[in-house]
Design a protein with these regions (language model features):
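Class I S-adenosyl-L-methionine-dependent methyltransferase catalytic core
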Residues: 1-199
Length: 199
């Protein structure tokens, strides 16, 4: 069995973020939305968000100070933050959207905090098995079902030390801050390798 990476660091293939942007309309539209990427790592997701030009502001944060890099856009910030710490969220500015690939073993702690501190919604890249009603998330998921799932087929590869694809199915889970009266929309993304311009 392969060992877990330190801090659960598995960079997100850029094409998965392009697929998210192609599949979901983020409001406010027309370059007005603000975004926080709170588990930024080396910027795999935030670099695509910035390149897309769809957002007015993309701020980044990470628990590892070594992964915090200078902001490149006027008005943007990059800071050190433990996304499992309620106090860190309380000190942070509020954003329209939180978009990230959280460390899987910390996701149950991060998701409620991110959801409570976004204005419009959040998009989280998670294993599809996150839907299972485990003790550490069952109640929260029952009260906050996702508005949309974008499931990737074939499975993407997150580890450079494995051949082919990974052994777990992943999906973008999208929540809207003010309820979801239409149920959960399910989209199978079978052409994700054709999205965007990044590898």
């Amino acid at each position: 069995m392969l060992a877990r990476q330190p801090l659960d660091f598995y960079p997100t293939p850029g094409l998965l973020t392009w697929a998210l942007l192609d599949s979901h309309r983020f409001v406010p539209w027309r370059n007005q939305a603000t975004v926080l990427e709170p588990c930024n790592g080396e910027g795999a997701i935030s670099d695509v968000l910035k390149e897309s030009g769809l957002f007015r502001l993309v701020d980044t944060a990470d628990i590892d100070p070594a992964k915090t890099k200078p902001a490149t856009a006027i008005g943007a910030t990059s800071f050190t933050m433990d996304a499992t710490d309620p106090g860190a969220w309380a000190r942070s500015a509020r954003y329209d959207w939180v978009i990230t690939n959280p460390p899987y073993n910390q996701a149950p702690a991060i998701l409620p905090l991110a959801f409570g501190n976004c204005r419009v919604g959040m998009a989280m890249l998670l294993r599809l098995s996150y839907l299972e009603p485990c003790a550490n998330r069952a109640s929260w998921l029952a009260e906050h079902p996702p508005a949309k799932l974008i499931v990737f087929n074939p499975r993407p590869q997150f580890r450079a030390d494995t051949g082919g694809t990974d052994s777990v199915t992943t999906a973008w889970f999208i929540w809207h801050r003010f309820g979801n009266s239409q149920g959960t929309e399910l989209e199978f993304c079978t052409n994700w390798r054709n999205h965007g311009t990044n590898d």
